[in-house]
């Protein structure tokens, strides 16, 4: 019974991802469909169209098995080691700088939203 419940929850999560992909494709948006799907899920959770309990176990399972989604990346690293040896330092710098930028923007935005929320209450 647990596997049926888990499968149903994962299927529901994938439905949001597929819907986001479809919207991105139909509207020719420059945003990845998975991001649109996550946004749709957020809206559905916010307005109680989808209850947290309906997806909790499936989301937890996917997070626990997250390492499996990185295996193709590891294989690509091995496959393109010549490219990495040529551009490795550049790639590492780009990854570090972009991670720093994302972290800074996320922190500043969170701080701004918390200040705004604090002033409203």
From Swiss-Prot:
Subcellular location: Cell membrane
Membrane topology: Multi-pass membrane protein
Entry keyword set: Cell membrane, Cytolysis, Membrane, Transmembrane, Transmembrane helix
Residues passing through the membrane, by range: 3-23, 30-50, 58-78, 89-109
Keyword check for Ligase: no
Keyword Cell wall biogenesis/degradation attributed: no
One term under GO cellular component: plasma membrane
GO biological process, one term: programmed cell death
Cystine pairs: none
Alphabetical list of PANTHER family matching this protein: HOLIN-LIKE PROTEIN CIDA, HOLIN-LIKE PROTEIN CIDA-RELATED
Family to which this protein belongs: Belongs to the CidA/LrgA family. CidA subfamily.
Its job: Increases the activity of extracellular murein hydrolases possibly by mediating their export via hole formation. Inhibited by the antiholin-like proteins LrgAB. In an unstressed cell, the LrgAB products probably inhibit the function of the CidA protein. When a cell is stressed by the addition of antibiotics or by other factors in the environment, CidA possibly oligomerizes within the bacterial cell membrane, creating lesions that disrupt the proton motive force, which in turn results in loss of cell viability.
UniProt-recorded name of the protein: Holin-like protein CidA
Gene: cidA
